[in-house]
Amino acid sequence: MNGIKHIFITGGVVSSIGKGLTAASLGSLLTMRGLKVFIKKLDPYLNVDPGTMNPLQHGEVFITEDGAETDLDVGHYERFLDVDLDRTANVTTGQVYSKVITLERTGRYLGETVQVIPHITDEIKRRIRLAPDDIDVIITEIGGTVGDIESQPFIEAARQIRREVGRENCCFIHVSLVPFLESAGEQKTKPTQHSVAILRAAGIQPDALVLRSDKPISSANQKKIALMCDVSAVVNAVTVPNIYEIPCVLNQHGLDKFVIKHLDLEAGEIDWSYWDDVLDAIENNRSEIEIAIIGKYTGLPDAYISVIEALRAGGFESKTKVNIKWVDSDDENLEDQLENINGACIPGGFGIRGIEGLIKAIRICREREIPTLGICLGMQCMVIEYARHVVGMHGASSTEFTDDTQWPVVTTMLEQRDILIDDQFGGTMRLGSYRAVLSVGSLAASLYGTTDIHERHRHRYEVNNGYAQRLVERGLIVSGRNTEQDLIEFIELDRKDHPFYIGTQAHPECKSRPKRPHPLFKGLVAAALARKEIAEFNSGKTVLQ
């Protein structure tokens, strides 16, 4: 094996077809065979990063250890490969053009006419090749759909890389939809044929096809697609109820073996130990609970995809299936919506819309002693609710929502004030991994099993230290601080007053893994399960174990 091998994942017919999960699953399979894999996503949009994009359009923003605001697929990569990626794992058209224009303005092109080819494509190729020195394979997912005008420079850059490294060192996998028409009663292969034709017109002949469908594709149709697209390796990836089955599906169809042979990789036998326990927990769960995600963007579950997966992982060890109940913070019937839930999670967000609903929901959870985890904005709203209804600071709020509030219990971070004045919103928050010191004997410390931790952050507002003492005097516990900046990172209630009530300024969902569930989510699931078992015991439905 000579040099780094490249695998490119493209998509056809429709977007959101599963390219990211295909890339993550293939990366997991190669990793389980002992290969060192680096994986990245190319996003064709002109935004520099997704940090300022509407979550209802784009989905969640996933934060890396080094503080990059990235596409949600990077979260899938980290969870499936059990790795921590950095900012080089997500490349956007905005980043590429910004860099090229900066180079042009500083005279680095020595008077050349700056063009898409070669200058833009050269910068894309440079970013594709960025990876640790000991990597065997770079998997690159090209976002969007072939034929999109925005994707063309990325497709061309990938074609050039194949030419430069040699066909034997490069593998193109095209993920395409094979739709089933109910009216005709049959699956249609033409969309995939046309998609591959567009790819071939761009100079790329795919080496393998991953055909997405809700129903199995007949052998005849698979052979037809193979013939018409001139591709021998055809995999039918039928929709599965659990995304962690996808590596098994691809392996059963031999995709990883094909890639290894095509690229002449020195790979060992596959080690399924990473997934065996996870799949066993999913398929053989012993109990079920319902946890409400109370948020501003519940219309698009992808806006909270890492929270969803962290909650699911939180139940794997105890073989507890976590069912999600979506509760919109603008819902007028919050009391009824939260009536029979076993636990609640209030994730992050921005802006004033839905805030009063969040505060109302948090009060319900606190007073009903529902196990509750607040994340980022969720923690801030927990503080606001407590200040209003326990401490008596009527009208308490955050300066994010109300500039002239009498009780700004949540306020703009000092270093963020000038940034906001200058309207510099992109990439300027407190981003990345920061240290927190937890109070000995606190719920937080007991969950983490240590008092010295690091978590990923994405915020520009903080709990106001000026009101901390009044909150503490009335029972709110400040259980974790960043000692370098004296920032409040964790709050909670005493376990004598509430079975599980904790908030963090961080985004712990970004560090959860299927085999290593995050302690906060694991704790929430355990508390929710205990609440359910106690309720069933009291109603005579079951006997406590």
Swiss-Prot record:
| EC code(s) of this entry | 6.3.4.2
Record-given protein name: CTP synthase
Enzyme active site: C376 (nucleophile), H507, E509
> Which family does this protein fall into?
Belongs to the CTP synthase family.
Residues engaged in binding UTP: S15, K188, T189, K190, P191, T192, Q193, K224
> Between which residues do disulfide bridges form?
none
Misc remark: CTPSs have evolved a hybrid strategy for distinguishing between UTP and CTP. The overlapping regions of the product feedback inhibitory and substrate sites recognize a common feature in both compounds, the triphosphate moiety. To differentiate isosteric substrate and product pyrimidine rings, an additional pocket far from the expected kinase/ligase catalytic site, specifically recognizes the cytosine and ribose portions of the product inhibitor.
Self-association or partners: how does it assemble? Homotetramer.
What range(s) does the Glutamine amidotransferase type-1 domain occupy?
A: 290-534
Cross-referenced HAMAP family, in alphabetical order?
PyrG (MF_01227)
The gene designation is: pyrG
